[in-house]
């Protein structure tokens, strides 16, 4: 029986989402479509009468801005927002800034799918010569984390994301849910996928099939042990949501005209 409710979502669309590039830890902002997605998400949650007590985000602009816009639509701007690098997107290492379709042409669609969706596969690490290395690691936000700068990842599998996310879930988010607080998590695609895997008990093999579209709220109903009661639910127009999921899946494929 459901005892608690939790809402999570992947942030609204950013410029590099639109350009089909691996964004990861590069701090891209929402584009015009992403801004509207965030507002629509807020309207959807308002129509369902959600009242939040606490919001958790990553320390990436696109997830924070998404949360702000949702709270604005809800008229709940006063709700506390807490941000942590542990909710950041997966670190895609050397793949950061590269075009997914071009990578599929160069390395094959299955390899790109493994890099994007599998549990254990880690992309090649980012090197200091990478054009975005210094932009990431010289950013002040990473100098005030709860781990030293030199211990932050240079590349991650989804397994790595779950391992760095779980302490934050266990120590900060879960206790608030257990206190009866209504919590919103505005994060990234892979941090949300990792948390879904943990809460729903999704297998290492099955997680490759879980895709999250941008800007769509996900409802999780949890029991007293904070395990899901039934599968997660996408809130909104289901036909549009399925089309958005397909769009994300197709990002790692070669367009037919190029085959």
From Swiss-Prot:
Active-site residues annotated for this sequence: 11 (tele-phosphohistidine intermediate), 89 (proton donor/acceptor)
Activity regulation annotation text: At alkaline pH BPGM favors the synthase reaction; however, at lower pH the phosphatase reaction is dominant. Inhibited by citrate.
Recorded GO MF terms: bisphosphoglycerate mutase activity; hydrolase activity; phosphoglycerate mutase activity
SMART domains: PGAM
Reactions performed catalytically: (2R)-3-phospho-glyceroyl phosphate = (2R)-2,3-bisphosphoglycerate + H(+); (2R)-2-phosphoglycerate = (2R)-3-phosphoglycerate
InterPro entries: His_Pase_superF_clade-1, His_PPase_superfam, PG/BPGM_mutase_AS, Phosphogly_mut1
GO biological process: glycolytic process
Keyword Transit peptide: no
PANTHER family, A to Z: PHOSPHOGLYCERATE MUTASE
UniProt function note: Plays a major role in regulating hemoglobin oxygen affinity by controlling the levels of its allosteric effector 2,3-bisphosphoglycerate (2,3-BPG). Also exhibits mutase (EC 5.4.2.11) activity.
Family: Belongs to the phosphoglycerate mutase family. BPG-dependent PGAM subfamily.
Designated name of the protein: Bisphosphoglycerate mutase
Organism: Bos taurus
């Amino acid at each position: 029986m459901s005892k608690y409710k939790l809402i999570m979502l992947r942030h609204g669309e950013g410029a590099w989402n639109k350009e089909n590039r691996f964004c990861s830890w590069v701090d891209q902002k929402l584009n015009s479509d992403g801004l509207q997605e965030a507002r629509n998400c807020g309207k959807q949650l308002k129509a369902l009468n959600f009242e939040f007590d606490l919001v958790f985000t990553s320390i990436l602009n696109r997830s924070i801005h998404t949360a702000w816009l949702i709270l604005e639509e809800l008229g709940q701007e006063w709700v506390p927002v807490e941000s942590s690098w542990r909710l950041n997107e997966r670190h895609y290492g050397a793949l950061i800034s590269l075009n997914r379709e071009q990578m599929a042409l160069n390395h094959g669609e299955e390899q790109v799918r493994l890099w994007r969706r599998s549990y254990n596969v880690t992309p090649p690490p980012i090197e200091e010569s990478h054009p975005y290395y210094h932009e990431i690691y010289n950013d002040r936000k990473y100098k005030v984390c709860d781990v030293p700068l030199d211990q932050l990842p240079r590349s991650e599998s989804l397994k790595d994301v779950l391992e760095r996310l779980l302490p934050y879930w266990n120590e900060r988010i879960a206790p608030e849910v257990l206190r009866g607080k209504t919590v919103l998590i505005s994060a990234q695609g892979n941090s949300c996928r990792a948390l879904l895997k943990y809460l729903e008990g999704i297998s290492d093999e099955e997680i490759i099939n879980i895709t999250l579209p941008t800007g769509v709220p996900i409802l999780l109903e949890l029991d007293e042990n904070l395990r899901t009661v039934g599968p997660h639910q996408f809130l909104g127009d289901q036909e549009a949501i399925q089309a958005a999921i397909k769009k994300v899946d197709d990002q790692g494929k070669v367009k037919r005209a190029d085959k």
